[in-house]
Regions:
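Secretory/extracellular carbohydrate-interaction modules
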Residues: 25-85
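Short, solvent-exposed beta-strand-to-loop segments that form ligand-recognition rims
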Residues: 120-141
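Ligand-recognition surfaces built from glycine- and aromatic
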Residues: 134-164
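Short, exposed beta-strand/loop patches in secreted or surface proteins that constitute
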Residues: 14-19, 70-76, 110, 132
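Low-complexity, Ser/Thr/Pro/Gly-rich disordered linker/stalk regions
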Residues: 1-46, 116, 164
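Short, aromatic/His-centered strand-loop micro-motif at the edge of beta-sheets
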Residues: 86-107
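Beta-strand-rich interaction surfaces with strong enrichment in secreted/lumenal proteins
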Residues: 35-42, 94-100, 142-143
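Short tryptophan-centered beta-strand motifs in secreted/extracellular beta-sheet-rich domains
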Residues: 50-52, 103-121
Length: 164
């Protein structure tokens, strides 16, 4: 198991991080602040797993890496998972794959391999796709959007076996 990085996350673009009960709350400094995020203080290259145990109070728990983004409880359609490809920024909408029960903790794992990525929520694969992620180096982040507050109790980065 990798180190829990919640104590080391850096606020970005209006992000306010509040420590509370063994977790952190992440909010934007303004009601509709777009892309506020708590950023890891390190650069990651594929293959790795970006794992968050988190919850949202309403909408928009977002995870980012390079040009990629995962959007759970999207404000336009809370049940649709939005996946933006880290290499191309191509957007995918997956019906009935994006809902997280507000107020409940969820384990989200974003596995980024050299040539594919998967999104796993509470043990269920919600996205599996191909791409070339071999040349990307970027810092992962997690945050809210459009007035939501996201809480995170675990934020880990784990190297993956390239054969996986």
């Amino acid at each position: 198991m990798s180190e829990n990085l919640i104590a080391h996350l850096v606020p970005h673009q209006g992000c306010v991080i509040t420590r509370r009960d063994g977790a952190i709350e992440i909010a934007g400094s303004a009601m509709n602040w777009v892309m506020s995020a708590a950023v890891a203080p390190l650069l990651c290259r594929a293959p790795f797993a970006f794992r968050v145990v988190g919850k949202t109070d309403s909408t928009n728990l977002r995870m980012h890496w390079h040009r990629g983004e995962l959007i759970f409880n999207w404000e336009c359609s809370v049940r649709e998972l939005r996946v933006h490809d880290p290499a191309t920024a191509e957007q995918h909408g997956l019906k009935d794959k994006g809902f997280l029960t507000p107020g409940d903790w969820h384990e989200i794992v974003w596995e980024i391999g050299l040539d594919r990525m998967r999104v796993i929520v509470d043990g269920e694969v919600r996205f599996d796709g191909k791409g070339d992620y071999s040349g990307i180096e970027s810092a992962p982040s997690v945050g809210p959007c459009f007035g939501s507050t996201v809480s995170v109790r675990e934020f880990t980065i784990t190297p993956l076996d390239q054969a996986a």
